[in-house]
């Protein structure tokens, strides 16, 4: 895993109190050193649960700007959520396939 974020990489949120299985989101774009946008599902509740949310903001709130703690946009409130989530890092797709 890496702290480097780029479009196509997968943000991995670690298991925590209310999020017993963790969460994955695909980076759609990098906005700044502290903000990315992601595509993900099952973040909201109620009628939005299960829907794929596209280009949703995620904010790095870690003290060292290392993407170890993030806040995620919560569509029903139209704002970042109150909870800060531990992030395990980013998984990057392979850019090349090994020759056979």
Q: Language-model features: where?
A:
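Aromatic- and glycine-rich peptidoglycan recognition patches
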Residues: 32-100
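...with weaker cross-activation on analogous glycine-rich loops/strands in unrelated enzymes
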Residues: 1-45
């Amino acid at each position: 895993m890496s702290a480097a974020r780029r479009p196509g990489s997968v943000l991995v949120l670690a298991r925590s109190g209310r999020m017993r299985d963790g969460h994955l989101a695909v980076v759609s774009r990098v906005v700044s050193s502290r903000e990315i946008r992601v595509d993900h599902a099952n973040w909201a509740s109620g009628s939005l649960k299960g829907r794929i949310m596209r280009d949703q903001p995620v904010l790095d709130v870690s003290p060292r700007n290392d993407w170890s703690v993030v806040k995620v946009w919560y569509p029903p409130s139209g704002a970042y959520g109150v909870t800060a989530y531990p992030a395990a890092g980013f998984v990057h797709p392979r850019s090349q396939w090994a020759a056979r």
